[in-house]
Amino acid sequence: HLEKLLDLAAKSMSVSRQHAYLNALLNAKKIRKINPSGDLQRVIQFLESENDTIWSTATQLAGLWKLEVARPRLEQILKNKQSKQQRKNAAIDSLIAMGGEKTRQFFDQQIVDEQNTYEQKITLIKGQLKLQPNLAAKRAINLLQNIPNTQDSGSVFAAFIGNRGATQALTNELKGKKLSQNVALKGMQLAESSPTRPKALIAVLQKAGGLKAMKMSLSKDEMITMIER
């Protein structure tokens, strides 16, 4: 049954049908944990697709099916500054699903590569966070200490604050570190407004930015105004 879906996807010229077949295969893997029999590498042909949805679905399948042959293409998407964010996100999820030392090494090498933009590094840190939260926290702080645009720091903090283990990793790594006042304020604003309101993280951010306790009592609007100066 599942093998037939892969056959139909390969033979169909309709983008909507291709997506329907590939999505059914994706759900079968995610929900029922089953793969089609036969040659799974046939899904690789869809990595040539110009349709982002088809490409992303096929990429997720390649990762979940552990198709190492797809790895170089996925890495290239993440190295290319012109790649669409949708494709980058799918490539990261796929590499995480493949797992292994190759994935961990690739993420870290790209994060520390000075040729990559801050946007690229932020995307990669979000991926690394799912595999190595402590190392991701270390890389994130290094990025936050050198980030040119305070607003960009928000997406770094948000990635950690949404997860308890990640928040703890960032809190531990921040101890004894220094951040610019604006970056620290940005992190505090996000931490203060999050449902979990992590007090330990707020405290180390206050110390890292050299902020006085009174600034903790600023309203959200006042904090935003200070950050945007």
Enumerate the predicted regions with their spans:
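Long, ordered, helix-rich scaffold segments
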Residues: 1-229
